[in-house]
């Protein structure tokens, strides 16, 4: 589910990711992928929270990443202003030359994140 994160006057598309779901990517002609993630803060959460994401390469775990984040004061989700995005956190993965499918999943039950994928050549 794409969501528009508003930062000042700029709108950036992120994809909502809930526990139990995976977002898949099939990069072509790239050397590196950067996954940007922002935790969705809702009312009962404190100002600082932790979360974990796991990156898969085909059916093999590529890596598990643990993040600590805090609420962002200058960004909102256009489609749901009650949800406050956290400050962005990222992980980079190096890609092999052959074709692979990469996916990312959230490991924390009861939480959701917004994910964006950037490719580098």
Specify the residue positions occupied by each region the protein language model found.
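Short coil-to-beta strand junction motifs in C2/discoidin
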Residues: 45-54
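Tight coil/turn sites that cap or link beta-strands
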Residues: 10, 18-20, 30, 97-100, ...
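A short beta-strand element within beta-rich, extracytoplasmic domains
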Residues: 29-42, 104-105
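Conserved long hydrophobic alpha-helices within structured protein cores
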Residues: 25-35, 59-65
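Glycan-recognition and processing domains
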Residues: 1-27, 41-45, 66, 72-83, ...
